[in-house]
Regions:
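Metallo-beta-lactamase
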Residues: 2-5, 100-149, 195-201
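Active-site metal-binding motif and surrounding structural segment of the metallo-beta-lactamase
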Residues: 41, 52-99
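Active-site neighborhood of phospho(di)ester-bond hydrolases with catalytic His/Asp-centered motifs
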Residues: 46-48, 70-78, 98-101, 160-164, ...
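Structural motif
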Residues: 42-44, 72, 134, 158-161, ...
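FMN-binding flavodoxin-like domain, especially the glycine-rich phosphate-binding loop
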Residues: 172-214, 218-221, 263-278, 288-386
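Short, charged N-terminal beta->alpha structural module
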Residues: 249-271
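Metal-dependent phosphodiesterase/nuclease catalytic metal-binding core
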Residues: 37, 151-215, 223-250
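Conserved beta-strand hairpin/beta-sheet module of binuclear metal-dependent hydrolase folds
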Residues: 2-62, 151-154, 158-162, 257
Length: 386
């Protein structure tokens, strides 16, 4: 695929994968591992692909070289889905140099038993690789989302190579009917979300660049309305709500708490609120995390289980915490047969999160719904709808 006259796409699509990073469901739409070629007087290849696709990737590369030989392999990110082809590339093109951060070369020793010391070029923030007619200026992007990461900026065609930044789930040969944001959001908050301050730092650097195209390592090449993508990443990485709305995440066993959640959702919708509801035992928890970050209000609803909260709820709250969940209003719904304690436990688990405002009202379901708990639902719906 031609991105510009001298920049080509040589990535691959993976439709065999079911779980990305061993946990994120991509079984329906697969995954893309992106790689690019910059054809200047010298040729640079940007990143490789996952281990199962190295031969296909090298074939894609040969198809665009037109008999020429690459001079450089630029490694922006060492995660194996982007670095598995390094050794094969260096063997096939023995005159080529490898360009990466010092941290990436340290990782190469761990993965390949060598840092290619006779052929390596260490670069850091602000340094330039001149290809003749094109050049790459490197932008340090540590912890977006690994410590060795670099972005690079090609100044002639105004292209930002953004490593895992601006990536999304899904193969590139399938059109996503939901557009970019949904699976990009699930990807961001699942994989990059913990590192918001580092994303903010690299966005500040990028603000000084005239960016016309963004080439990420996953998902589509972004060529239009780039302000939208940059603004969205700024919102996500500053932990601000993207939209007004309420996510309800619940863990129910015998259906009594589920019934309370359904009544609460209906009461909120009747008050004009946008509501998304997740059964943490059955729905994709990564999507629940995604919507918890997307909206400005969250309801946690759990049964009391062995004096604590149900394990799926505990996992959900822990996942939010480790991804730096903050700046939201949280309401609690609890249930139990004799001594409901879930609200107390959830309150304690929320204590370490930054700028969390607990709703003044809660709902307690003792056994099953009754007039008292239904009245609490209405009161909570009023509070969350103000």
């Amino acid at each position: 695929m031609e991105i510009t006259k001298d920049i080509r796409y040589i990535g691959v699509d993976d439709h065999d994968i079911d779980l990305f990073e061993g946990q994120y469901d991509v079984s329906e739409n697969g995954m893309a591992y992106n790689s690019y070629v910059i054809l200047g007087d010298k040729i640079a290849v940007a990143d490789s692909v996952d281990a199962g696709f190295v031969d296909e990737w090298l074939g894609n590369l040969e198809a665009v070289l037109d008999g020429r030989t690459p001079d450089y392999l630029v490694v922006h990110h060492m995660e194996p889905d982007h670095s598995a082809g390094i050794a094969a590339f260096m063997e096939r093109y023995p005159q080529a140099q490898i360009v990466a951060s010092i941290g990436a070369f340290r990782m190469m020793v761990n993965y390949f038993g060598t840092d290619f010391s006779e052929r390596k070029m260490v670069v850091k923030d602000g340094e330039v690789l001149d290809l003749g007619g094109h050049s790459l200026t490197f932008v340090g992007a540590p912890n977006v989302h690994w410590p060795e990461v670099l972005f690079s900026y090609e100044s002639t065609d105004k292209v930002l190579f953004s490593a895992d930044g601006f990536g999304k789930f899904g193969a590139n040969d399938i059109e996503d009917p939901e557009g970019w944001a949904c699976e990009a959001r699930r990807y961001y908050f699942g994989i990059v979300g913990k590192f918001g301050k580092f994303v903010q730092a690299v966005l500040k650097k990028a603000a000084d660049l005239d960016i016309q195209i963004i080439c990420p390592l996953h998902g589509p090449v972004l060529t239009e309305n780039l302000g939208y993508y940059l603004d969205t990443y700024n919102t996500w990485s500053s932990y601000q709500p993207e939209d007004e709305g309420i996510t309800i995440a619940y863990a129910s066993v015998y259906g009594h708490l589920k019934a309370a959640v359904e009544e609460l959702a209906s009461a909120l919708e009747a008050r004009g609120q946008k509501v998304s509801v997740f059964d943490l035992a059955r729905d994709d928890m990564a999507e629940a995390v995604e919507d918890a970050f997307r909206y400005d209000r969250l309801v946690l609803a759990s049964i009391t289980y062995q004096g604590e909260i149900f394990p799926f709820m505990s996992t959900f709250i822990h996942t939010l915490a480790e991804h730096a969940y903050q700046n939201r209003t949280v309401a609690l719904v609890e249930a139990g047969s004799w001594a409901p304690a879930a609200a107390k436990v959830m309150t304690k688990e929320l204590e370490g999160m930054k700028d969390i405002t607990l709703a003044q009202n809660k709902v307690t379901v003792l056994g099953s719904l009754n007039d008292a708990s239904r009245a609490q639902i209405e009161t909570l719906a009023d509070e969350l709808s103000k």
